[in-house]
Amino acid sequence: MEASVGQAGKTKFQIDLRRYLREDGEDEGLIHLICEIAEASKYIVNSIRTGDLGVAGTSNLYGEEQLALDVLSDRILRKRLAKSGVVSNIVSEETNDIVFVAPHRTGNYSVSYDPLDGSSLVDVNLAVGTIVSIYKGSDLMQPGNKQAAALYILYGPRTTLVYTTGNGVHEFGMNQLMEYTLLRRNIRMESKASIYAPGGLRSLYTDGTDKFVRQLETNGVKLRYSGGLVPDINQMLMKGKGIFFYPHLQNAPQGKLRLLFELNPMAFLMEQAGGAASNGHQRILDLVPQQFDERSPFFCGCREDVELAETLIREEKQIR
């Protein structure tokens, strides 16, 4: 499933994030950008531990009330990206507008991100995370298969950073000095799931998705769900044998999750680990976004289970 480096958190030789990226032959600009995001996460995790859990009094572009931690995390990450010297454009799930940093400068990257996914879980002390998608150049409206890198940072009992640049999926952990060191390299998914994490109200599932859940249960696949996208996807990757899905619903045919901010980066990570990600009809990474707030159904995990979901949803459409 994976190649670990000693025991997690007990590596014989501590390999830090920047060194690992350099040894992997990554572009210096991309290395700098990923490391800047890692630096920003140190301030975000400190804000989670000590910050204001009250409501900020504003709404994001989806009409969702913003928590103070959402606003603070967005500000931390945005400032770090804008001053990195390697970013052309920025768009956050929490704002209405794209931020043009240096759109005409060549060799730069553009970044879409969710600064604190699952922030409503903080006050009950559940894990939350930051999700980041990176593209070359200034165009953010590209299919996910054009991503230069994707990563998430999970703020749980431990703080971990999981990334891909198209050369496998690797996990780093924040140590006592708040530096990221290698825990696992080349994380791999198995072909079939033993756990599943569903989103949305099951009574609103369409027939195909409901059949899919019943088939999982018949196969002995166990329910393991935290209510947060980042910890649930992380569980699937680290266990290597699971599936997460937030499907189309009877009252929400496009589901809930956002293509640019959540689905593309998670799909890139999952595929790089040998899994699959689909909207029930086609590969997530082939979808061309038409707007920043575009949503899509999402089935992400072990390849055979994603294919089963596609088959049952296809049959549902044929019956109609």
From Swiss-Prot:
Pathway: Carbohydrate biosynthesis; gluconeogenesis. One of its GO terms (molecular function) is magnesium ion binding. It is an enzyme of class 3 (hydrolase). It catalyses: beta-D-fructose 1,6-bisphosphate + H2O = beta-D-fructose 6-phosphate + phosphate. Its main location: cytoplasm. GO terms for biological process: fructose 1,6-bisphosphate metabolic process; fructose 6-phosphate metabolic process; fructose metabolic process; gluconeogenesis; sucrose biosynthetic process. It is found in: Cytoplasm. Pfam families: FBPase, FBPase_C. Mg(2+) 1 binds at residues 93, 114, 116. InterPro entries: FBPase_C_dom, FBPase_class-1, FBPase_N, FBPtase, Fructose_bisphosphatase_AS, SBPase. GO terms for cellular component: cytosol. Mg(2+) 2 binds at residues 114, 117, 262. Binds 2 magnesium ions per subunit. CDD domains: FBPase. Substrate binds at residues 117-120, 225, 256. Its cofactor is Mg(2+). Keywords: Carbohydrate metabolism, Cytoplasm, Hydrolase, Magnesium, Metal-binding. Its EC number is 3.1.3.11. It comes from the Bacteria. Homotetramer. Belongs to the FBPase class 1 family. This is Fructose-1,6-bisphosphatase class 1. It comes from Syntrophotalea carbinolica (strain DSM 2380 / NBRC 103641 / GraBd1) (Pelobacter carbinolicus).
